[in-house]
Amino acid sequence: MMSAAPVLLYTKTGCPYCAAKRAELAARGVAVREINVSERPEVVAELLKVTRGRRIVPVVVEGGRIEIAPGGGSSF
């Protein structure tokens, strides 16, 4: 059974860690809403609140749980 709210996945263009996390979530059948900070710079402030100022992706927000750069990350 899929959760009602999609998982938020913050990424940037050209980030191999982001691509790996996207593929992992897709393989698990998880509904994902991807937010690319390269294409949407207006969301950077929102992301920095989530990461407490760390400029790194990928960031996964699932319910109340936040994973910052699981398995490695790229700065932006």
Model feature map: region roles:
Residues 61-76:
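Non-catalytic, surface beta->alpha helical segment in thiol-disulfide oxidoreductase systems
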Residues 1-33:
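Local sequence-structure signature of Cys/Sec-based thiol-disulfide redox active-site neighborhoods
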Residues 19, 42, 70:
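Residues that form or flank phosphate/diphosphate-binding pockets in enzymes
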Residues 17, 43-46, 59:
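Residue-level recognition of specific faces of alpha-helices
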Residues 51-63:
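Structural micro-motif
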Residues 36-54:
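Thioredoxin-like thiol-disulfide oxidoreductase module
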Residues 21, 41, 61:
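Solvent-exposed, flexible loop/coil residues
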Residues 16, 39, 67:
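Glycine-/small-residue-rich active-site loops that bind phosphorylated ligands and cofactors
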